[in-house]
Regions:
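Active-site-proximal loop/turn and secondary-structure-junction residues that shape catalytic pockets
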Residues: 184, 240-241, 270
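Active-site phosphate-binding strand-loop segment of PLP-dependent enzymes
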Residues: 213-266
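A broad, structural surface signal
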Residues: 8, 12-26, 62, 66, ...
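PLP-dependent aspartate aminotransferase-fold enzymes
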Residues: 85-99, 103-231
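A generic structural motif
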Residues: 2-5, 209, 241
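N-terminal entrance/gating region of PLP-dependent enzymes' catalytic architecture
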Residues: 1-135
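Histidine-centered active-site/metal-ligand motif
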Residues: 83, 185, 263-265
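Short, well-ordered loop/turn elements at secondary-structure boundaries
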Residues: 69, 77, 133-135, 173-175, ...
Length: 271
């Protein structure tokens, strides 16, 4: 049994959706930036139990316009100034359309060679654009929070304590410390907690009048921890904090991390 419509029905529905998207981009400033609904207004328009029968695409698009759109905050709106100062692009929308159609997984080269090789090439372009050394490489993750998590996991293993193999309990290990600005993203705390560092070992470094991490305060915290038997493990610097878009002094922080043999992660997901 085929659940999808025939090609002609799909093509007509896709054209209607693209027409709506094009009009939306062109007329987005006609919408209020913030929705004007009250809590529960959207949910009340839908049945409490899922329907056992589907609906045609044109009916779904009508429901989207009439029921969903009124409850949307328009992040692409020219007068939207909250949170992240970036908007979606038309090219990005089409790219996601093609990606959704392919429905491919790129966890290995074999699962989709094009995904792996395009990822590698795109990161080379980014590396060269930033003027970074030619021996640098990387991977693209789904969120900056995952990047922070993986960086802290790498930092934990770089201590040489083989925590991945032997765990953090049942043997005599020093407490590993993670340092970040008091304005760092919450993913630092969440990642450190998930990886077993413990809340008391997440050290928030004081900021200056520009809300940037103070390198001298970082150096003092690391020195104090070493004197008290803790093992400094990782430093997270932020370029564009969520609260104020502050940029930590990465060079000075990096010099301290290098001197103290701490893993340095730069959370460069601006805001």
């Amino acid at each position: 049994m085929k659940l999808d419509p025939n090609a002609d029905e799909f093509r007509a529905a896709a054209h209607a959706a693209v027409d709506w998207i094009a009009d939306y981009f062109q007329n987005i400033d006609s919408f209020p930036v913030l929705s004007r609904v009250q809590p529960g207004d959207i949910a009340r328009q839908f049945a409490t139990a899922a329907s056992e029968e589907g609906k045609p695409y044109d009916a779904l698009l009508t429901e989207f316009r009439d029921k969903i759109l009124p409850g949307i905050t328009h992040w692409n709106h020219p007068s939207f100034f909250a949170y992240f100062s970036i908007t979606g692009s038309q090219a990005g929308v089409l790219g996601e359309l093609l990606t959704a159609a392919l429905n491919a997984n790129g966890m290995l080269w074999k699962t989709s060679p094009s995904l792996t090789e395009l990822e590698t090439r795109a990161l080379q372009w980014l590396r060269d654009a930033l003027g970074l050394p030619s021996n640098l490489f990387g991977i693209i993750n789904d969120t900056a929070s995952v990047n922070v998590f993986l960086a802290l996991a790498a930092a934990r293993e770089a201590t040489g304590l083989n925590i991945r193999g032997e765990g953090m309990t049942g043997r005599d290990l020093p407490a590993l410390r993670v340092y970040c600005s008091e304005h760092a993203h919450s993913s630092v705390d969440k990642g450190a907690l998930a990886l077993g560092f413990g809340a008391k070992n997440i050290i928030k470094i004081a900021s200056d009048e520009e809300f940037c991490m103070r390198p001298e305060a970082l150096a003092e915290a690391i020195a104090s921890d070493r004197a008290n038997g803790f093992l400094p493990c990782a430093v997270v610097a932020t370029t564009g904090t969520t609260s104020t878009a502050a940029v930590d002094p990465v060079r000075a922080i990096g010099e301290i991390a290098q001197r103290e043999k701490c893993w340095l992660h730069v959370d460069a997901a601006y805001a």
